[in-house]
Amino acid sequence: MPKPMPKALVTAWVAAFNRQDVDALAAMYAEDAVNHQVAEHPVLGREAIRSMFQAGFAAAEMVCIVENLFEDGEWAILEWRDPLGLRGCGFFHVVEGLIRFQRGYWDKLSFLRQHGLPIPQD
């Protein structure tokens, strides 16, 4: 079976994210993948990434609406928004059909406020 190209993999990632399917999401990452949402510390490894998604979905109703999705070689770039108006951008490095590295840019303070979550005081 051919390995999915970055754009196709990220399209499947968005569908799994919107279903809050942590098992499907985790399966898209390499065992030693890194997920770095710049508002947070990097998350290392597939199981830790699965736990990150579980915690996120338990805390807030998250939906990813694709604005633009680009592919360049091993990279996919996702520009997104959510129903509350939050916007962000994600970079996915896909190697042999799995996400090896992901970096996301979004406004954490706006996210916390929109979802009524506590704002850290550090």
Predicted segments with their positions:
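C-terminal and inter-domain tail/linker signature
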Residues: M1-D122
